[in-house]
Amino acid sequence: MSSLRTADDTWDIATSVGSTAVMVAASRAAETERDEALIRDPYARLLVTGAGTGIWESVLDAKFVETVAAADAEAAAIFEHMNSYQAVRTHFFDAFFTAAAEAGIRQIVILASGLDSRAYRLDWPSGTTVYEIDQPKVLEYKSATLAEHGVEPVATRREVGIDLRHDWPAALRGAGFDPSRPTAWLAEGLLMYLPADAQDRLFEQITELSAPGSRVAAETAGVQAEDRRQQMRERFERIAEKFDMTASLDIQQLIYEDPDRADVADWLDAHGWTATAVSSQQEMRRLDRWALPADLTDDDAFSNFVTAEKLS
């Protein structure tokens, strides 16, 4: 269970779950500036620097990164791994959307979109509409920040400012969503912030709204044994204290580690979808981005990247 979450908690871009979107955008910005980047997000740095979260802006400072590397090799490896994980994850789901567009899907829904910039940076075909669902303040920050810099979306972009714990299907329809048309759905960086029963309900709602030919992609929530979870928590607490990042790295307090959480691929297969799961470890190694210490094994809790298609 999460110790900082309540049934009706809300947030903006600088607090609670909202601030994790800044962390992810910081990783995309760092990746974009690599010589051989897996993804290019020219807007990530803009979104990070205006968020007011402090530490994630610092992570984009080359001198800070050099200081961490010089002071603590383990911390440097973990930060590198975190950035690489986000890059690999983004790369995987970018490819999912590219394939969906090539298959003729023109209706996109990004759940808990945060600072996702795909509506602005992917090469969407004409006639594509991207619906972004998230807390109103998060969506307002993103659209206002990019508009201030003259950035316009490539696709038609429609904001659906609502908590996913409320009646988001009705709000989505109200924004123009057509459930009779095939849709490509994405739940990236979301499921770990939902209790197990809420995850099931989310996929039930997606299924109800999906016409044949629809596709869905999701990053699963990893579940660890308690002793391993405590070991990882202590490792991150030590790093956070050493580099004055305590408030920013307390992500474990925001997520739900329900042991009875359904396997996403199995759930989809049982509810009218044909699903495939790729382990994040496998994908990171395939792209030569594995950087964690050797004491972490495949038995540790890493997410899977799941894609599925609804055939009927």
Swiss-Prot record:
S-adenosyl-L-methionine binds at D134, D163, L164. The keyword Methyltransferase applies. InterPro entries: Ppm1/Ppm2/Tcmp, SAM-dependent_MTases_sf, SAM_mthyl_Trfase_ML2640-like. GO terms for molecular function: methyltransferase activity. It comes from the Bacteria. The keyword Ribonucleoprotein does not apply. Pfam families: LCM. Its EC number is 2.1.1.-. Belongs to the UPF0677 family. PANTHER family: S-ADENOSYL-L-METHIONINE-DEPENDENT METHYLTRANSFERASE YKTD-RELATED (PTHR43619), S-ADENOSYL-L-METHIONINE-DEPENDENT METHYLTRANSFERASES SUPERFAMILY PROTEIN (PTHR43619:SF2). This is Putative S-adenosyl-L-methionine-dependent methyltransferase Mjls_0078. It comes from Mycobacterium sp. (strain JLS).
